[in-house]
């Protein structure tokens, strides 16, 4: 992305940001906590699989989180379904009380490992100093999101927080983006959205007629995906500092 203000963002008056893996390193915390919890609940499971259990839990190959964002299950039911699928992958039974025990081990490990990305506070502070309202839009639950923001110190740096359960629909449904804009007090065309997921964040925002940025922290994106976003006029961002730079924030 070029340095300095972006002409494509000249009309932007507010910013909406995804939370997980955009502001907060949720991936690393889930990997660590999922492995800890699986080792506690299923100590007889293959150790090589236990070591990968957190990664498997987060990857959610059965799509339970997607079903939750579409309103097909509750947040709690979604998480318990993912635990059940993880037990099957580990070759273990999900007995009575196992899901609760897994969560009881997972939550403290997750909270201990949770960190904000180092650029998050800097970028948010620069946006605020420049008078740009900021909102967070996430497909996670309200209580869980509030706890994550409190633990990482980001809760006081936002004007509006919109979650899947408080909105009644999730990304990439255009209604989620439009309602978040309404709560910020800006039109979609003048509200920049930035997130790390290609479909639910970058392309979802573009489909909602918003300027968007695709955050790719871990290297260059897949060439085919890069072509897709380039064709939609969506810049690829390496960090959140580029959001503040692109909006001309000192």
What are these regions (language model features)?
Residues 1-15, 27-28, 97, 121, ...:
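Asp-based, Mg2+/Mn2+-dependent phosphohydrolase catalytic module
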């Amino acid at each position: 992305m070029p340095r300095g203000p972006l002409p494509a963002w000249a009309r932007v008056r507010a910013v909406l940001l995804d939370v997980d893996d955009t502001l907060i390193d949720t991936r690393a915390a889930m990997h660590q906590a999922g492995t800890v919890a699986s080792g506690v609940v299923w100590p007889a499971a293959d150790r090589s699989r236990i070591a990968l259990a957190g990664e498997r839990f987060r990857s959610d190959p059965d799509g339970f989180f997607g079903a939750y964002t579409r309103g097909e299950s509750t947040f709690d039911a979604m998480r318990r379904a993912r635990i059940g699928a993880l037990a099957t992958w580990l070759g273990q039974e999900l007995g009575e009380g196992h899901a609760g025990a897994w969560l009881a081990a997972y939550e403290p490990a997750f909270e201990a490992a949770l960190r904000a990305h180092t650029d998050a506070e800097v970028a948010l502070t620069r946006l605020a100093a420049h008078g740009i309202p900021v909102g967070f839009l996430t497909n996670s639950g309200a209580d869980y999101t509030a706890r994550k923001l409190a633990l990482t110190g980001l809760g006081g740096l936002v004007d509006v927080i919109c979650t899947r359960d408080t909105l009644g629909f999730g990304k990439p449904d255009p209604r989620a983006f439009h309602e978040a804009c309404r709560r910020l007090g800006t039109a979609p065309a003048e509200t920049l959205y930035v997130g790390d997921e290609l479909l639910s964040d970058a392309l979802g925002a573009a489909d909602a007629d918003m300027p968007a940025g695709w955050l790719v922290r871990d290297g260059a994106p897949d060439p085919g995906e890069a072509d897709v976003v380039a064709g939609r006029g969506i810049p690829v961002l390496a960090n959140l500092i580029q959001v503040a730079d692109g909006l001309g924030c000192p």
